[in-house]
């Protein structure tokens, strides 16, 4: 018994000595590392950038607080441009909802739905609403469009720009020098558009102000002004007026592609012209639109990197769409083709009014149920949708195939809903 007790004491003492020895070794190693003058392994700057570009946006926003160096790096134009070159596999669909709350007050919500990373939108059957982007500062404003992660909110004549990644919101100054904005004209039109200048690597906001010319005997049918504001620049510079060769009145939505924006407009007669604004040179050019095109329900779209015009005038009646593609800008050459909806989908287009809301990166046209009608006096009336189920159609112009994509799990049930469009860029630009 005594022998067993002595043996246990010896074993316990040995365990203590071994434990103490391991602790001593760890402390000695730590002390030697502190005394060592060998430099830490060098990580190339390009590799640091490459690692950071693979991180999600939330992580990068947290890393801005690590140090001033990290903050300046993440907010730098070089890093932002590097992120834009990294292909994103998440396409977000932006949806607006209007409904009455429990106190019968009208409320508006801005939601975005995201696909799963790595999913292919060409085979998707649904989007899932998972983000509420509504903020009190947006109250009274409507979302005009989204470009490269930048949202444009308008409440004429005011405009706000919101970065969906950094959650930064800026209010642009009023255009006090505009003669048309200051006028109280019932047919006055104000349009804003965000664009990117690839030469100067700047984001700019263009404001188009126009109205009919009511003075009898004047040769000019319309009065218009173009103003430009540089985002992230010197705030004291403000808005700059851009000369326009011919006053005109925009009649369609605006397409931004390859550093330019395009839209149809009336210049003198009611024949539509294609107006192009170059974000780099800040020059405006006006080209003749295809002779046989009808401006009503015509929208500029991107068609495999080219400017195209898609007309839906005959979609509901004849189940056809007309597509014009600009093949040569210098010669103003257009190609035309008529698309006939597949027989199995004719009932859909005959029973539903649709409008164009842009294109996907796979060149599918986004078609949204249309619930807006115009009175004879030009008044816009928004009617409720036929259902509280949210959905869009994606139309492949080359394959001539249309498919329905549902928008699932909206947090509010309402027939007043609309889709702004798709965007798949995370932008860390400081506004």
Swiss-Prot record:
PROSITE patterns, A to Z: FBOX
Domain F-box: 37-83
UniProt keyword annotations, A-Z: Kelch repeat, Repeat
SUPFAM superfamilies for this protein: F-box domain (SSF81383)
Kelch-type repeats, residues: 143-189, 227-275
Source organism, top-level taxon: Eukaryota
Name of a matching Pfam family: F-box
Keyword Protein biosynthesis: no
Descriptive protein name: F-box/kelch-repeat protein At4g19930
Source species: Arabidopsis thaliana
């Amino acid at each position: 018994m005594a022998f067993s007790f002595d043996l246990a004491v010896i074993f316990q003492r040995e365990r203590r000595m071994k434990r103490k020895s391991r602790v001593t070794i760890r402390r000695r190693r730590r002390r030697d590392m502190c005394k060592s003058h060998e430099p830490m392994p060098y990580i190339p700057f390009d590799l640091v950038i490459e690692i950071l570009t693979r991180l999600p946006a939330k992580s990068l926003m947290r890393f801005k607080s690590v140090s001033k160096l990290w903050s300046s790096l993440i907010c730098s134009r070089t890093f932002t441009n590097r992120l834009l070159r990294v292909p994103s596999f998440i396409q977000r669909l932006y949806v607006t909802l209007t409904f009455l709350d429990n106190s019968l007050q009208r409320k508006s919500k801005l939601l975005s739905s995201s696909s799963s990373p790595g999913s292919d939108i060409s085979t998707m059957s649904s989007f899932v609403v998972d983000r509420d982007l509504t903020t009190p500062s947006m109250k009274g404003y409507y979302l005009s469009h989204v470009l490269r992660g930048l949202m444009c909110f308008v409440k004429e004549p005011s405009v706000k720009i919101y970065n969906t990644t950094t959650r930064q919101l800026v209010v642009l100054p009023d255009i006090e020098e505009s003669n048309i904005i200051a006028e109280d004209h019932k047919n006055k039109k104000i349009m804003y558009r965000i664009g990117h200048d690839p030469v100067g690597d700047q984001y700019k906001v263009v404001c188009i102000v126009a109205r009919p010319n009511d003075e009898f005997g004047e040769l000019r049918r319309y009065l218009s002004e173009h103003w430009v504001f540089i985002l992230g620049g010197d705030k004291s510079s403000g808005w700059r007026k851009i000369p326009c060769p011919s006053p005109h009145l925009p009649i369609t939505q605006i397409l931004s592609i390859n550093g330019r924006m395009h839209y149809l407009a009336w210049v003198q007669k009611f024949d539509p012209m294609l107006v192009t604004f170059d974000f780099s040179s800040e020059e405006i050019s006006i080209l003749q639109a295809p002779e046989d095109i009808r401006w009503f329900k015509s929208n500029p779209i991107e068609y495999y990197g080219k400017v195209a015009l898609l007309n839906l005038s005959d979609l509901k009646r004849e189940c056809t769409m007309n597509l014009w593609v600009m093949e040569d800008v210098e010669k103003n050459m257009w190609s035309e083709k008529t698309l006939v909806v597949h027989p199995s989908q004719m009932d859909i287009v005959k029973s539903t009014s649709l409008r164009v809301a842009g294109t996907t990166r796979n060149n599918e046209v986004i078609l949204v149920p249309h619930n807006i009608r115009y009175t004879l006096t030009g008044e816009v009336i928004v009617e409720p949708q036929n259902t509280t189920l949210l959905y869009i159609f994606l139309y492949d112009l080359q394959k001539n195939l249309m498919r329905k994509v549902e928008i699932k799990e909206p947090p509010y049930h309402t027939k007043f809903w609309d889709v702004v469009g798709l965007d798949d860029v995370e932008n860390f630009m400081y506004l």
